[in-house]
Amino acid sequence: MEEFQGYLEFDGARQHNFLYPFFFRESIYVLAYDHGLNRLNRNRSIFLENAGYDTKYSSLIVKRLIFRIYEQNHLIISTNDFSQNPFFGHTNHFYYQTISALFAVIVEIPFSLRLVSSFGGKQLAKSYNLQSIHSIFPFLEDKLSHLNYVLDVLIPYPIHLEILVQTLRYRVKDASSLHLLRFCLYEYWNWKNFYTQKKSILNTKFFLFLYNCHVCEYESIFFFLRKRSSHLRSTSSGVLFERIFFYRKIEHLLKVFVNNFQDILGLFKDPFIHYVRYHGKCILAAKDTPLLMNKWKYYFVNLWQWHFSVWFQWQKVHINKLSKDNLDFLGYLSSLRLNPLVVRSQMLENSFLIDNVRKEFDTKIPICSIIGSFAKEKFCNVLGYPISKSTWMDSSDSDILDRFVRICRNLSHYHSGSSKKKNLYRIKYILRLSCVKTLARKHKSTVRAFLKRLGSVLLEEFLTGEEQVLSLIFSRGYSPSQRFYRVRIWYLDIIYLNDLVNHE
């Protein structure tokens, strides 16, 4: 937020949430330019003057863009203008790409200001551990053992761009900016290009913001239904069509229900409900009966279809019983394992046995999916038999070894929370043997002869990093290599999924 304060003065626009005037400020373009350079140089910024000045900001191009926005009549532009008319050496493709880049930066301003003001000047505590993907698994270990059902939901994408604009309208009260956004979406992108274009980092950021607004709108309604679930019935879905004054309508609805329909209320409020969203999916875990879980499934489907006008199939919502079904969650197959226990109890002179069952959170590695990813990347065949990586044979030996070691350590790091390490051993075996076959093929040697010459060096490279990490976790009184294979380890520094893990 400090970078916004350095470029802008918010007092006028902040009061009315006007975003449109920001499109005419050169400082905003400088801010968008800085964001473009901070993307690891994976693409050139659209505000650069020419290819010979990769770090030079062009004020002339910015002035021309501002003039074009100011003079443009968005109501009379045709599709032919979009594809043919040049603009100072640039096409309208460049013009709309710039608008999307600016909108991605400008629209963050009111949300950031709202977040800062909500803390009342207090310093926001930073917890980097909560940013880790693994931080959710200790929570599930503690909570899922008391629950029995999980709804696995695939969040649908909006099938029409107008739905995204309408969703943003609930949070941005600036009609001019929304009209400009709607115009750019319809003129620059068709539906297919909007969802598949990933070459431009700025457009991807722009899409992610619209999608997150769409999901936040859905979650705000869902959480409201969750809190009021003891009063709301499926017959009341008609009042949810309009988001404006939503809470006022729902409060009025509750008063009517309480006063006039007290005898027919369906009370099914359950405090043991947990919600997690990840990678376009969400799970709803609860301690409910199958009937109540089907009710929640019914609410999900109707919320998307009738409120968001998105076609949502029943097959996209799965009801999993944790004691029987596996939940495919963030690269793990999670379930509840029932461990029978026999306890001997003695009372005075009589002794008897008590049969008990303990629930444990079980996490397994989806080995079939990972082998499929390995086969796609040519580390092994479809049966899991290691093969040489022919596309890497032009690299140096140290580079090839470093690539295999890095992949092996990343996967071992991520799947260290597995309950059983057998599948983890298989992953390491495939990568190590694939590495040996790649190097042996490069040097036109057999695997046996190559291992006799450099086998100890390869084994040391693969094991050194893992032993160093484990030695920091366990005390000296234990053997890290032995403890590692008996317990689950959750690392709090993992902020993204490896492509081989994210097989979807």
From Swiss-Prot:
Keywords: Chloroplast, mRNA processing, Plastid, RNA-binding, tRNA processing
Signal peptide stretch: none
One Pfam family cited in the UniProt record for this chain: MatK_N
Keyword Repressor appears in the UniProt entry: no
Organism superkingdom: Eukaryota
GO terms, biological process: mRNA processing; RNA splicing; tRNA processing
Localisation: Plastid, Chloroplast
UniProt GO cellular component terms: chloroplast
Protein's UniProt keywords contain Acyltransferase: no
Entry's Gene Ontology molecular function annotations: RNA binding
Family label: Belongs to the intron maturase 2 family. MatK subfamily.
Protein purpose: Usually encoded in the trnK tRNA gene intron. Probably assists in splicing its own and other chloroplast group II introns.
Descriptive protein name: Maturase K
